[in-house]
Amino acid sequence: MKKLLVLFASLTMFACSKDLGGEVTPINVPSSTTLTGNITATTTLTSDKEWVLKGYVYVTDGAKLIIQPGTIIKSDISEKGALCIERGAQIVAEGTAAKPIIFTSGRPAGERTPGDWGGIVILGRAKTNRTSEPTIEGGIGRAFGGTNDLDNSGILKYVRIEYAGIAAMPNSEINALTLGGVGSGTTIENVQTIYANDDAFEFFGGTVNAKNLYAYGTADDDYDFDFGYRGKVSNSVSKRDPQFVDNGDAGNGVECDNDGTGSTAEPFTHPILDG
């Protein structure tokens, strides 16, 4: 049985500060709302409160998740969160340079570590080179790909993804941003990953174009292409942190495979890297 979206709204909390005149001034601390299960209708995450992902949260076929500029989404600490946009669903996360949308760990600042939560997974209906319908890795358990290379999964602009990347099992991880069969109608621009515990950006097939991506301090690959990805990634860079490496993986700036076995399945993986 599918779980419904459950919103646990906490009461607004207050802290106090004492000014030089001896007056006690209340300071509003934003309330938090927990997201869990399935999002089945158009839902807006507003910037006036803090949002928490508890476990795997799915935006289902026909639903749309809208996220306002400046919104902060954290993960539950004990039940690590991940956000999956299923085929036929959309995410509209359109931040600005002054008000980016931030996905991050639920731990206090200064205590956050890579792998504190899963990451963002977007699935579409564009072509892959799999002969049977593939299921995205990382324990998400949702199919991706199809025949519509123009498919539109929404907008991701001015978004920062921090401390993501968990392994559901060996060789089956969630990356900071995973794109499976995402079509060229989707907009991916100005997205930064920080301390991803697996790959920063991985493209499993599809035709989505992306620009102005920045991967910082990634454990494994900064950019990973496979399963017949045929889009363009432009004006994108990465920077490594020598103090943070995953000795179990041969992390690369770019990894590009047709598939895990190096087959000649078509369409061939053929990313265009431009600047």
Predicted region positions:
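Beta-strand/loop edge motif enriched in small/polar residues
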Residues: S17-G275
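Sec-dependent N-terminal signal peptides
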Residues: L4-M13
